[in-house]
Amino acid sequence: MRDFDFSFNHKACEGCGAKCCVGESGYIFVTIQEMQQISAFLKLELEEFSQKYVKKVGYKFSLLEKDAKDLGLACVFLDLETKKCQIYSARPKQCQTFPFWESVKTFSKEQKEAFCQSCPGITQKTKETKVR
């Protein structure tokens, strides 16, 4: 992505252990359309899916988290044994676009360094390699 000062190697995901899906509490925001897509993928009615897997956060919706023992919290759809997403083909846009989130552009230097260190697929660009 051109507007970011880091690059991402998606092949690193294969052996990473789903670090982007575990850790501190956070939100995995989903739209109504994404909830419909995921519920259809799971062969659930939207209402049942919403009651079982979604919480309201202000005026938005977020997927629930579950206890991942020593790892902290995890997305409710992360299989903790295989470290694979159970809804990968229907996953929300927030997951599809990781790590290229607009909010990352506003991170402090320290936040950006921690973010980049949290994922083995992220490499910060040096001044010489930044795309203009």
Curated annotation (Swiss-Prot):
Superkingdom assignment: Bacteria
Similarity comment text for this entry: To M.jannaschii MJ0661.
Pfam families: CxxCxxCC (PF03692)
InterPro entries: Puta_zinc/iron-chelating_dom
Protein's name in the database: Uncharacterized protein jhp_0259
